[in-house]
Amino acid sequence: MNEEVKKNEQFMEVLPAADIIDDEKSAIISLEVPGANAQTVTVEVKDQILSMEARSSLTWHGMQLLYKRSFQLSDAVDVENISARTQDGVLTVTLPKSERAKVHRIQVQ
């Protein structure tokens, strides 16, 4: 796992590596957040910035791990229908694309 680590007073902030899969219908972001679950994860969008924060039950040098990551979203993302879930220490966020972002083929005659 490629991570950037920062210390603050109570938490060890970790920038988790992200896997991004993009297709015609959606983009899917997966982040490794071991020790976190649905109750300790926050996902929000403000001003086209997707922010994710996950508190882990794990500690490092006596400090609780806090995973944080943000992404700039394009106008193609349907913000109202973003979904997120955690399973086996992985946070998966699905970013559906809006209808206007989908490719419409025009038949040439």
Predicted regions and their residues:
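Alpha-crystallin/small heat shock protein
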Residues: 1-109
